Amino acid sequence: MGLPVAFIKNMREILGEEGLAEYLDSFEKPKFTGLRVNTSKISVEEFLRISPFKLCRVPWTENGFYYTEEDSPTHHPYYYAGLYYIQEPSAMAPAAVLPVERGERVLDLCAAPGGKATELGAKLNHTGLLVANDASASRTKALLKNLEVFGIPNLLVTSEMGDRLDRYFHEYFDKILIDAQCSGEGMFRKQAHMIPAWEKQGPEVFANMQREILRQAAELLKPGGTMLYSTCTFSKLENEGSIDGFLAEHPEFTLEEIPRQEGFCSGMPELVGSRFPLERCVRLFPHKIDGEGHFLALLKKAGEKIPGAPEPAGRPGRIPAELEAFLQDVSMPMELSRIVVKDTRVFLMPEGVGRCPGLRFLRSGLYLGELLKKRFEPSQAFAMALKKEEYASVIDLSAADDRVIRYLKGETLEIEDGESSRPEGWQLVCVDGYPLGWGKLIRGTLRNKYFSGWRMNA
C-alpha cells in the first residue's frame, strides 16, 4: 500500500523508527471485526448463552466482542431484533469511557451513523434524554434507523451546527460525546480509499474544524459536566493539538484520567509543546491493539452540577379513542401527558423537552404510529422499544424457524393455533423473546407489518 510521504514523516515523529516499523507491519495483520451487545435489550451473559457466533471479548469494553467474518452476524435475526451493533473494535472505546449514568441528559454531537449514540442510549436504558445530532442531514437517516432498531425511546435526532443547538440547550447536558470528523488516518489499514482524500484535505483543515466543534460543545455542557473528544486519526494537530488549543482558551476545563487497558498508549504533550497534562489522553494504535486506532480525551467542566428539574408534565391531552384502545394492550410505562399528535402521527416525547421552534429535527421522541380512518397503526419504532411482556398478544418464533427470515423479507405467514396469545388482531412478532415488528392476524394468516424499508434484502 502506498502511504503518503508526509504521513510517514508524521508517524515517524510520533512513533520513532522502531514504532513506525511495527505500525507498517500491522498492515499485514488481519482486519478485526466487532459487535457490541445492546444491554438495554439483553444482558451480556444472556447474549453469550444464545449467541451462535464464536466471540472473543474486546478488552476495553464490557459488552464488545470480536467475531469472525464467516459468522456474518448482519444476516442473523438477532441483528434485526437490535441485540447488537456491528462496530470496529477501537471505535467502541469512546462511549465505553464516557461515564454516562441513568437519567442524565446526553448529547452525541457528531452522531451519524450511530455506533456511539446507540451505546449511549443503551447506557441511559430508557431514562433521561439522548440528543443525537449530526450536521450532515443526509447521514441522519442511517442514524435514526440504528437508534430505532436499538429500541431507544428517549431521544431527539437533530441536524444542526453546535452554535444553533446552543440557542435551545445552553449548558444543558450532563455528558457530551464529540467523535469529530477527522482525516481518518486510523482507517488507512481498512479503507485504502481514505488515502487520496487525506492527500487532498489533510490534518490542518480538520484541526480547525475540530477546535470550533469543541468550542461549541463547551457552551452546551453543564458546569460539572464531562465530555469525551475522540478521533480515528493519529495526527498530532487533530489530537493533542486540538486539545491543547481548547484548554488554552477554556481554563474552566481540565483533563481527566482515562483508565488504562492493555495496549492503551498515553497522549504525547511533547508533540505540540503543551503545558497541559496531555499524557492523560489515550492513543490506540493497530500495532498495539487488535483494532484500527483512536484518540480519546476526557474533559471536565468546573462548577457544581445542578440537577436539572424535569419540565412539568402538564395536563394530559385528549388521547384519540383509536390510540387509547390500542394502548390498553400495552404495559410499557409511559406518561400519557407526553403523547403528542402531529397531524396524524403520534409521538411519545422525552421528559424535560420543551418546544424548540426552528430546530431541524429528524425525530422528536418515540414515534408510536399513525392515526388512520377509525384505527391506529403502530410503528416499527414502537415495536422495537417494547419488551415481549409489554404487549398483550405475541407470536414468538425460534431463530431456527424459517418463518423468521420470511417475516423479515416481508412475506405473509401462516400461524398455527396456540402460536399466538390471541387468535386475531395485532401481534408483536418476536424471535426467541425479542421483538422484531408487528403483524396482524386474521383467521390463521399473519399479515406482515414489518417496515418495508428495513426488510432483509430490501
Task: Label every PLM stretch briefly.
Residues 1-48, 292-295, 302-458:
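Polybasic, low-complexity RNA-engagement segments
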Residues 101-102, 166-179:
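A short acidic, Gly/Pro-enriched loop at the edge of an enzyme's catalytic core
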Residues 103-112:
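Conserved class I S-adenosyl-L-methionine
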Residues 113-126:
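Conserved SAM-binding loop of SAM-dependent methyltransferases across substrates and taxa
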Residues 124-125, 221-223:
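Helix-to-beta-strand junctions that scaffold the AdoMet/dcAdoMet cofactor pocket
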Residues 173, 226-229, 234-347, 352:
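Class I S-adenosyl-L-methionine
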